[in-house]
Amino acid sequence: MKWFLLMLIICNAVPLQGLTKIVSARPQVVNIGSVFTFNSLIGKVIKVAMDAAVEDVNASPSILNTTTLRIIMHDTKYNGFMSIMEPLQFMESETVAIIGPQRSTTARVVAHVATELKIPILSFSATDPTMSPLQFPFFIRTSQNDLFQMAAIADIVQFYGWREVVAIYGDDDYGRNGVAALGDRLSEKRCRISYKAALPPAPTRENITDLLIKVALSESRIIVVHASFIWGLELFNVARNLGMMSTGYVWIATNWLSTIIDTDSPLPLDTINNIQGVITLRLHTPNSIMKQNFVQRWHNLTHVGLSTYALYAYDTVWLLAQAIDDFFKKGGNVSFSKNPIISELGGGNLHLDALKVFDGGKIFLESILQVDRIGLTGRMKFTSDRNLVNPAFDVLNVIGTGYTTIGYWFNHSGLSVMPADEMENTSFSGQKLHSVVWPGHSIKIPRGWVFSNNGRHLRIGVPNRYRFEEVVSVKSNGMITGFCVDVFIAAINLLPYAVPFELVAFGNGHDNPSNSELVRLITTGVYDAGVGDITIITERTKMADFTQPYVESGLVVVAPVRKLGSSAMAFLRPFTPQMWLIAAASFLIVGAVIWCLEHKHNDEFRGPPRRQVITTFWFSFSTLFFSHRETTTSNLGRIVLIIWLFVVLIINSSYTASLTSILTVHQLSSPIKGIETLQTNHDPIGYPQGSFVRDYLIHELNIHVSRLVPLRSPEEYDKALRDGPGKGGVAAVVDERAYIELFLSNRCEFGIVGQEFTKNGWGFAFPRNSPLAVDVSAAILQLSENGDMQRIRDKWLLRKACSLQGAEIEVDRLELKSFWGLFVVCGVACVLALAVYTVLMIRQFGQQCPEEAEGSIRRRSSPSARIHSFLSFVKEKEEDAKARSSRERQLEDISANGSSRCN
C-alpha cells in the first residue's frame, strides 16, 4: 500500500513520457525569460527599460487583449557558467522566448540548445558577426551586427587616407570575430591591420602595459580598440601614462565607449582626460516624438544615463509582444512537450529530461521575423539575412566633458554630416565628416604612421653599376655616391622624423645588375627599399610601391651623325624630289585649267598661240608670289584660283620655315631616323646590360633577340657605334635619355635621332603599402619646389656644350605625304570646274548655232567633224560668236520674208 501511494505521488509530480501539456490559445499569462547581469553597465539600464516596456504592453488595449506579458529576469552575476545555466532553467518551464544572454560567447552556447528546443533567443548585446542564422536558426539579433560597425570604421580609415591600423581586442570569440570582420572591410578599401594585439578576457594592468609598449613600437598610429566594458577605460589610462594619448596618435573605439559615456555620465575628470580626442561609434537612433517622450520619462525612472541598449531592450519587448499577438491570431497554441532524443538519453543527475520543446516554436519564430513596426530605435524589421534594416551609426569625438557628433555612417551611403532624414531632401555629395579634435588637442589630421623606433636600420639596396658613375657609384672603400643617392638623402632629411638607414650595394660591380631583381628582393625582405636609377614600369609596380618620379627619362635612339656642310643647292633641301615634281606639275596643270576657263571671254588669255603659252606659264608661276597681273573674269576660274592660292600659301610658308632652319641651325645627318628605322632594317642594336630596355624591344617592338647586343659602359657604347654593323658593332643604341645626355656630353660625333618613344621616370622603390613611400614622395616634391633638386642635378648631371650639338639632328625634309590632302582638294576643284565648263559650252553651242549644228550633222556625220565644229565654237571669242549668230538670224528673217512675197 505504501509503494502504491508513493507511485501515485511520483506520477502526479512528474508527467509521463510523451504526455503533452496544452494551454489554451489565449492564456492569461505568457512568460518570457531574460538573463543578464543586473549590476553590469548594460544590465542596470535594460532592466529598467524592459520593466517599462512590459508595463506599456500590458497597459495597451491594442495588443495581446486579455493576455498578460510577464518577463522573468535572472541575474547571472558576471558568471559565464550562470549565463548558460539560467537560460536552461527557463527552458524547463513554459517560456516562449528568452531575451539574452548578454555576451556573444554565452549566446553561442545557449543558441545551440535553443535550436533543439525551438525556443527563440533574442539578444541586442550579442553582436558577434559570425553568429549566422544558418547555424543558429532560433537566434535573433535585435540590434545591429558588428559587421556594420567594422564597415563604418573602415570607411573612417579610408576617409582620412590612412592605410594601416593596429587592432586591440579581447582574446575571445567576440573580440577575434569582430577584428576579423574589420580586417575584411579594410581589405576592401585597400587597407589592412598591420598588428593584431590581443589581451586576455580579464587582463591585468601589467598585461595592458606590456601590450601597449609593443603597439608604441609599431609603425601605425591608428589604433582601433574593440574592448570590453570591464577593461576598456583601464587601457586608455595606461595609454595616457605611456604618452600614447599625444599628438600623432589616432584612437578609434567601438560602441563600448559611447555606451559608458551615455550610461555613467558625467565621468570622473581623470577618466575624461584619458579619452580626450578619441573617436567612438554609437548605434544611430533617429529622432522621433516617441523617443523624446521616452527620454523625458527615463529621468523619472532612474538616475542612470540612457544608452542605446536601453532603447533596444524596450523595442525588443514590444517586438516580442507583437509577435506573440500575431502568433495567437494565426491560431498558435502555447504548448510544450519533451524531446524524445533527450528522453532516450535519460536525465540522470543533470535532469536533462526536464527540458521541454516549444511545439509552436517555428510558427512563433516566423511571427517574430515578420514583425514590421516603428520603435524608439527606428524601424524594427528584419532582412532576409536576419539583420535589422537601415544599419547606421553616429560618429562621435570625445571633447571636454562629453562628446560632439562629427557625422553619421549609413550602410547605403557611407559617411555624412547629415542624418538620414535630412539626406533624403538633399543630393548626396560624397562622404564627409566635421572637423575633429585629435589626441593632444590637435586639429591637424594625423599622418597615421611613424617610422618604427625599434633601433633597426633600413637596408637600402643600391645597384652597383659599371656605367655612368654620375648616377650611382660604389667606391672601392664601400662609399656609395651619385645623383640618385644625393636625392634620396635630401628627401630623407626633409622628413619630420628620423629614418636610420644603411646603403647596401647590389651587384658585383662588373656586370650591371637587374633593377627588376632588386625590386623583387624588396618584396622578399632582403632590402627595405631600393635607391638608384630604377625606372618605374608596369612589371615593377606590381611588386612594390614607387615614389613620385624624381627624373623624367624616356627611351631614345643614339646613332652616329655627320655634319652637313654648306651647299650651293641648299635651297632644294626643304622638299623631297617627289615633292618638287608634284609641285611643279601642279603649277602647270592649274595654269592650263585657268587658260581653258578664261580663253573664250578674257582677252588676256587670247592671241597668237605663242603668246597664249607664255601667258599661261607666266600666270602659273607668278601665283607663287601672288604677283600675277592677269585677272580672272569667270566665276569658275576665280574659284579654282582661290583654292590654288591657298595651297600655294601653305607650301610657301612651309618651304620658308624649313629653309630657314636649314640655313641657320647646325645640321647633322644620320641614316637612322629613329626607332622606326630600327624596326624595319636588320642591323644590330645596342642596349644597356641589366636594363628593362631588352624586354621592351623584344616584347613591345617585336625586335628579334638575335639583333640585340648588351653593352656595359659608355666606352662600350662608343666603340660599338664607331665600329658599326660592318665591324661587329651596332647601328644604334637604345637607352634612357638621362644616360644618353651624359654619354653625348663629350661625344659630338653621335646624336639622338628621332623622338623619345616612351615616357618613364626614376623613382625609389618601397614595399607595398609602405607609408614611407608617400612621405618620401612629398619630400621629392618639396625638393623640386625649393630648387634643391635642380642644384643636385646640376652637380652631377650638368651637360657640356657638346651635348647640345649632339642633340641637334637633321631637320626632316618635307615630303609629299604632308601635303597630299591639299593637292587632292585642288585637283578635285580643277576637274569639277572643267566638267561644269564643258557642260555650259555644250549648252551654249546648241543654243547659239542650232542650224549649224543640225546642218553639220546632215552634211558630215563623222564624230571628228562634230568635235571640230564644237572646238571651233569654244575657241571663238564669245562676242564674235554672239554677233555671228545675230547676223545669221537676220539673214534667215530676210530670206523668209522674200519667200512669202513671191508666193
Curated annotation (Swiss-Prot):
Superkingdom classification of source: Eukaryota
TM segment ranges: 577-597, 607-627, 639-659, 822-842
GO biological process, any: induced systemic resistance, jasmonic acid mediated signaling pathway
A GO-annotated cellular component: plasma membrane
Cell location: Membrane
Compositionally skewed regions (Basic and acidic residues) per UniProt: 881-892
InterPro entries: ANF_lig-bd_rcpt, GABAb_receptor_plant_PBP1, Ionotropic_Glu_rcpt, Iontro_rcpt_C, Iontropic_Glu_rcpt_pln, Peripla_BP_I, Solute-binding_3/MltF_N
Cytoplasmic topological intervals: 598-606, 628-638, 843-903
Region forming the signal peptide: 1-25
Keywords assigned: Glycoprotein, Ion channel, Ion transport, Ligand-gated ion channel, Membrane, Receptor, Signal, Transmembrane, Transmembrane helix, Transport
Region annotated Disordered, chain positions: 881-903
Entry-linked Gene3D superfamilies: 1.10.287.70, 3.40.50.2300, Periplasmic binding protein-like II
UniProt membrane topology term: Multi-pass membrane protein
Tissue specificity statement from the Swiss-Prot or TrEMBL entry: Expressed predominantly in roots and siliques.
Principal location: membrane
Effect of disrupting the coding gene: Reduced wound-activated surface potential changes (WASP) duration in the systemic leaves, resulting in a decreased induction of the regulators of jasmonate-signaling. Glr3.3 and glr3.6 double mutant has no detectable changes in surface potential in systemic leaves and the induction of the regulators of jasmonate-signaling is more strongly decreased.
Glycosylation sites: N65, N207, N300, N333, N411, N425
Parts of the chain on the Extracellular side: 26-576, 660-821
Entry GO MF terms: calcium channel activity; glutamate receptor activity; ligand-gated monoatomic ion channel activity
Assembly notes: May form heteromers.
Role description: Glutamate-gated receptor that probably acts as a non-selective cation channel. Mediates leaf-to-leaf wound signaling. May be involved in light-signal transduction and calcium homeostasis via the regulation of calcium influx into cells.
Family: Belongs to the glutamate-gated ion channel (TC 1.A.10.1) family.
Stored PANTHER family: IONOTROPIC GLUTAMATE RECEPTOR (PTHR18966)
Protein name from the UniProt record: Glutamate receptor 3.6
Species of provenance: Arabidopsis thaliana (Mouse-ear cress)
Gene: GLR3.6
